[in-house]
Amino acid sequence: MVRIFHILKDDNPTEALAAISKEANGPDRDLSVLLIQEAVRLHPDLPVKIYVLEEDAQKRGIASEFESIHYEKMLDLILSSHSVVVW
């Protein structure tokens, strides 16, 4: 399973992004990755940053537009973010 932290830098994300976030919490998590990739491609101006754990990225060959980080840094990222959706 790909573990992605979807960081919303804005307190009021767009409806489209909210819908994608809702879908990402559903049972088809691989599909949610594709939806998020598409959202970033179509709306590059949205305040979105997606992080993938390095070990998951290596195992699954995650697309290069995702930024991978070490697991140890994940807690700091969560604590410093306005809101985080995890799936």
Where are these regions (language model features)?
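Short internal beta-strands
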Residues: 30-38, 43, 49-56
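Short, charged/polar "capping" segments at the starts of alpha-helices
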Residues: 13-16, 39-44, 59-60
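C-terminal structural segments of small proteins and small subunits
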Residues: 64-87
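Histidine-anchored nucleotide/phosphate-binding helix
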Residues: 11-36
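Extreme N-terminal starter segment of soluble prokaryotic enzymes
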Residues: 1-5
